[in-house]
Regions:
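Chalcogenol-based redox active-site neighborhoods
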Residues: 1-155
Length: 155
């Protein structure tokens, strides 16, 4: 089960698509963070979800929310995917230990061996402000992001 509102978000360090280390607690110094877990790079639904989020970056900017994608794919796969699709936000590799961050956030589908479609919005205080998920074959609606982001205090 995905971390519920009020739960402490686990701190972590993962590499982004360019190999740079990203630490959640460092990101939180600049404001809330939306962790968007998807199963696999280059898959149809994952690509369409990230494209939609890139196109609606203003939704997150209005509340100073940093958008961060997370998959169990390798850094090299994520770089190729991000460059091909032109995503406007960092994508982190939860490749090894395989799915460790997704598991800690309650967002790992153990049967599939990949992240589930889950979103965890973490407030500056390191606590989950909102979370939601959808089935493996279902994109999360943009309205769910609007609702989650609107639960945050204005910057």
């Amino acid at each position: 089960m995905v971390l519920a509102a009020g739960a402490a978000a686990p701190d972590f360090a993962l590499s982004d698509q360019y190999g740079s280390e990203t630490v959640l607690s460092d990101l939180l110094q600049d404001g809330p963070v939306a962790l968007v877990f998807v199963p696999f790079a280059f898959s149809r639904i994952c690509t369409s979800e990230f494209a939609e989020l890139s196109a609606h970056a203003d939704l997150f900017a209005e509340r100073s929310v940093q958008l961060v994608g997370i998959t169990v794919d390798s850094v090299w796969t994520l770089r190729a995917w991000a460059e091909q699709e032109g995503f406007s936000f960092p994508i982190l590799s939860d490749f090894w230990p395989h799915g460790e961050v997704a598991r800690a956030c309650g967002a790992l589908d153990e049967r599939m061996g990949a992240a589930a479609r889950a979103t965890v919005v973490v407030g500056r205080d390191g606590r989950v402000a909102a979370s939601f998920s959808s089935g493996a074959g279902e994109a999360r609606p943009l309205a769910a992001y609007r609702e989650a982001v609107s639960a945050l205090p204005r910057a």
